[in-house]
Amino acid sequence: MSLELLSKLETKIQAALETIELLKMELEEEKQKNHTLNEQNQQLSQDLTSWNEKVTGLVGLLNDEVSE
């Protein structure tokens, strides 16, 4: 191979490595976002369960009052 071809190959390999590094960084960012969203989803699910329990309790109290 000529030096020119080796130089071009080296440039392409370097560009590929830089692209891989950028993609790795983006992947880590997306993993962190996913983790944060999963935590928020879990909290919202707990909040929803809590509100459902409260509403069910209030509806039960209203039913008791209406029945009396």
Curated annotation (Swiss-Prot):
Domain of life the protein comes from: Bacteria
GO biological process, one term: division septum assembly
Signal peptide: none
Compartment(s) of residence: Cytoplasm
Coiled coil: 3-58
Main location: cytoplasm
GO cellular component, one term: cytoplasm
Annotated keywords: Cell cycle, Cell division, Coiled coil, Cytoplasm, Septation
Quaternary state and interactors: Homodimer. The ends of the coiled-coil dimer bind to each other, forming polymers. Interacts with FtsZ.
Role noted for this protein: Non-essential, abundant cell division factor that is required for proper Z-ring formation. It is recruited early to the divisome by direct interaction with FtsZ, stimulating Z-ring assembly and thereby promoting cell division earlier in the cell cycle. Its recruitment to the Z-ring requires functional FtsA or ZipA.
Family indicated by similarity: Belongs to the ZapB family.
Name this polypeptide is given: Cell division protein ZapB
Organism, as annotated: Shewanella loihica (strain ATCC BAA-1088 / PV-4)
Gene encoding the protein: zapB
